[in-house]
């Protein structure tokens, strides 16, 4: 497959053999892709990772379609995406599933945090296929695994509208997405939102 290197392969988690230890690695990668979001969860790191691991490949969540890039059999990078303009629904249902696993006081705190967080996302009217998570293990950052996985996903998915959010201070993620063709939805909202919306029409 174009963009992948020798000894690299990509699989959907729902079709791959994922061990318990790998689920934890994937959960850690997913958290690293959106650390400020998962920091909203008022619970221990271990519980947070367990909750995230439970949602990997789970329908009606942001992680429903999660792809794993392996190099020599070892997890190198992950990408999660939600198609058909369903990101708002997936985000809501995924959050509700998290809320149900929290205690009463934790729920109130998390819901309050979510409302504040939602205001920091630049609006996207037509999300198309939304790239919800993209992360690479630190040891393989220089190998460009994340960029290759993103290119693989775009090529495999075919023509269409793709969107994502990138934190305004995450210059590496902003550069990576713009390198493969994403652009800011609006140049007018600079400074208005912590998370900038990007779009790619293929």
Predicted regions and their residues:
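Active-site rim helix/loop that mediates acceptor-substrate recognition in acyltransferases
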Residues: 45-66, 70-72, 118
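Conserved beta-strand in the GNAT
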Residues: 68, 74-83, 130, 135
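Conserved active-site alpha-helix within GNAT-family acetyltransferase domains
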Residues: 143, 147-148, 169-186
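Conserved GNAT acetyl-CoA-binding A-motif
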Residues: 127-129, 156-168
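Conserved acyl-donor/pantetheine-binding loop and adjacent beta-alpha core of acyl/acetyltransferases
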Residues: 85-129
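Conserved GNAT-fold acetyl-CoA-binding loop/helix
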Residues: 34-54, 88, 110
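Conserved N-terminal entry element of GNAT/NAT acetyltransferase domains
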Residues: 1-24
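Conserved catalytic-core motifs of GNAT/GCN5-like acyltransferases
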Residues: 165, 183-197
């Amino acid at each position: 497959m174009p963009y992948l290197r020798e000894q690299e392969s990509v699989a959907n988690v729902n079709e791959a053999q994922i061990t318990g230890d790998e689920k934890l690695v994937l959960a850690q990668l997913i958290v690293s892709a959106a650390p400020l979001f998962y920091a909203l969860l008022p619970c221990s790191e271990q519980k947070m990772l367990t909750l995230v691991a439970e949602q990997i490949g789970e329908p009606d969540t942001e992680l429903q379609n999660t792809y794993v890039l392996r190099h020599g059999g070892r997890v190198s990078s992950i990408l999660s995406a939600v198609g058909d303009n369903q990101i708002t629904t997936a985000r809501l249902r995924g959050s509700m599933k998290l809320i149900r696993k929290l205690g009463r006081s934790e729920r109130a705190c998390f819901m309050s945090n979510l409302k504040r967080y939602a205001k920091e996302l630049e609006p996207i009217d037509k999300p198309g296929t939304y790239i919800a998570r993209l992360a690479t293990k630190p040891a393989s950052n220089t190998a460009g695994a994340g960029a290759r996985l993103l290119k693989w996903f775009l090529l495999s998915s075919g023509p269409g509208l793709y969107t994502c959010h990138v934190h305004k201070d995450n210059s590496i993620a902003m550069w990576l997405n713009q390198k493969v063709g994403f652009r800011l939805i609006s140049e007018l909202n600079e400074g208005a939102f912590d998370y900038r919306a990007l779009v790619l029409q293929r």
